[in-house]
Amino acid sequence: MTARQPDGANPKPVVLVLQDEPILAGIMRDFVEEAVCEAVVVRTAEAAVRTLEGRTDIRVVFADLDVRGSTTGLKLVAMIRDRWPPIELVLTGALAPDLDAIPARGVFCDKPFRENKVISAIRGFAA
């Protein structure tokens, strides 16, 4: 369920954060909030899909491609681009994928994070 904003209020853009490691999830959430966005944090690709199916207000997915589960990071990226084409993608991982695998309107931010790069990407896509 999406939170209702008071009449006349400008809601913050919503960013779905996918990260299975709690400490990294907290860091990623902090980056989203620093970008003046609302963070919705999930721990699995399957939970990310369920969240996207249930919400229409998500503008950006900030996802770790190394999350454990039955759906790999790049398969999730392809699914998001196919089912929710307007959603922008900020992707991360310990190892950079083949950059040709990153879809248009997507960016890869490697670890360790460069805070300014991540926040700028989120702000740019959420605007």
Task: Kindly give the residue locations of the regions a language model identified.
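Conserved phosphotransfer microenvironments
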Residues: D64-A78
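Short loop/helix-cap segments at secondary-structure boundaries that form the rim of catalytic
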Residues: A96-R105
